[in-house]
Amino acid sequence: MKSKFRHVALIGKYQTVASGASGASSRRVLEDIAHFLGAQGCEVVFEHDTAHNMGISGYPVLDVDAIGAKCDLGLVVGGDGTMLGIGRQLAKFGVPLIGINQGRLGFITDIPLDGYASALAPMLRGEFEEDHRSLMHARVMRDGRCVYDALAMNDVVVNRAATSGMVELRVEVDGHFVANQRADGLIIATPTGSTAYSLSAGGPLLHPSIPGWVLVPIAPHTLSNRPIVLANITEIAIEIISGRDASASFDTQSLASLLRGDRIVVTRSEHNVRFLHPRGWSYFDTLRQKLHWNEGVA
């Protein structure tokens, strides 16, 4: 049966051909998937950095903006980090994404590499589940002007430096003072990011359908300082009151150095990331498998 998606972009891990057997193996995987897509009636293109770094030739190559303008589907082969990076870039175009897991956990790249064809074939015919993930838009404000801005699908994290003491942070929500917090840092996580750093810091899991964020302190000085769930229509502002060499990271993929008095202002982005999953996909199945729930239970 002809594919529902005519133009499909392949995006892979950014390994270089100099990385030896691992790079060669990854290149073969991508080429095999491209051949499979072609057999399903898809016109395959490669994302520019993927093709360049993996040494792939013989297919059209497009940058991210061109993929957003011309492609019906993005197929991401890698781990969650690969998906986070391309998801932020393609969100404004509304291109749906399917993830094939070539990484470790794979919360958002949920199709196993082994046997991908049996999962992909019905999805290409239109048999899939779709869910949308919110993005955060973060700005670093210094003396009233924006000096850095970024999108985040997982989290925005304000951290102390590795060799310095705690930071003191002033937290406001929609202009209302919440508290001054002394801690190693503070995490603002989306439902997607609630299974990442936020979870390891004691934050709750948020179902992707919940229009919320979670604010999680990292090793707070006061034990009563607990995580709090907020509506994602709020504006969260974090001001650096004291502490040396603090920084803000966005999905752990970009970083901004912070000075005393800087404010990190976080709002919801107008764009969502569209994920496609195999028919019958369940968020709870993913949690159970990835977090090893029920293991050893008869």
UniProtKB/Swiss-Prot annotation:
GO terms for cellular component: cytoplasm. Belongs to the NAD kinase family. Involved in the regulation of the intracellular balance of NAD and NADP, and is a key enzyme in the biosynthesis of NADP. Catalyzes specifically the phosphorylation on 2'-hydroxyl of the adenosine moiety of NAD to yield NADP. SUPFAM superfamilies: NAD kinase/diacylglycerol kinase-like. This is NAD kinase. It is found in: Cytoplasm. GO terms for biological process: NAD metabolic process; NADP biosynthetic process. Its EC number is 2.7.1.23. InterPro entries: ATP-NAD_kinase_N, ATP-NAD_kinase_PpnK-typ_C, NAD/diacylglycerol_kinase_sf, NADK. The active site is at 80 (proton acceptor). The keyword NADP applies. The gene is nadK. It is an enzyme of class 2 (transferase). It comes from the Bacteria. It catalyses: NAD(+) + ATP = ADP + NADP(+) + H(+). It comes from Albidiferax ferrireducens (strain ATCC BAA-621 / DSM 15236 / T118).
